[in-house]
Amino acid sequence: MGSFSIWHWLIVLVIIALVFGTKKLRNVGSDLGSAVKGFKEGMKDASADKPADQVTQQRVSDDTIDVQAKEKSNS
């Protein structure tokens, strides 16, 4: 009783095809496919834009900070 057999699924599919019609089901399938395709393209665009947004910082070793400059001038 837990899972349905293949015959149960075939009967359900036939009933759905009779209720909605094959043309309507084809339109739903193509809409779903285009939505998945658009989602995948959006994910590719988002991952391609991510490295461009990151700013690289360079560290210079001999720079002084204001606190260090103030301490040097007081000494």
UniProtKB/Swiss-Prot annotation:
It is found in: Cell inner membrane. The lineage of its organism: Bacteria, Pseudomonadati, Pseudomonadota, Betaproteobacteria, Burkholderiales. This is Sec-independent protein translocase protein TatA. One of its GO terms (biological process) is protein transport by the Tat complex. HAMAP family: TatA_E. GO terms for molecular function: protein transmembrane transporter activity. It holds the Pfam family TatA_B_E. Residues 45-75 are annotated as: Disordered. NCBIfam families: PRK02958.1 (NF002813), tatAE (TIGR01411). It is a single-pass membrane protein. Part of the twin-arginine translocation (Tat) system that transports large folded proteins containing a characteristic twin-arginine motif in their signal peptide across membranes. TatA could form the protein-conducting channel of the Tat system. The Tat system comprises two distinct complexes: a TatABC complex, containing multiple copies of TatA, TatB and TatC subunits, and a separate TatA complex, containing only TatA subunits. Substrates initially bind to the TatABC complex, which probably triggers association of the separate TatA complex to form the active translocon. The chain crosses the membrane at residues 1-21. It comes from the Bacteria. GO terms for cellular component: TAT protein transport complex. Keywords: Cell inner membrane, Cell membrane, Membrane, Protein transport, Translocation, Transmembrane, Transmembrane helix, Transport. Belongs to the TatA/E family.
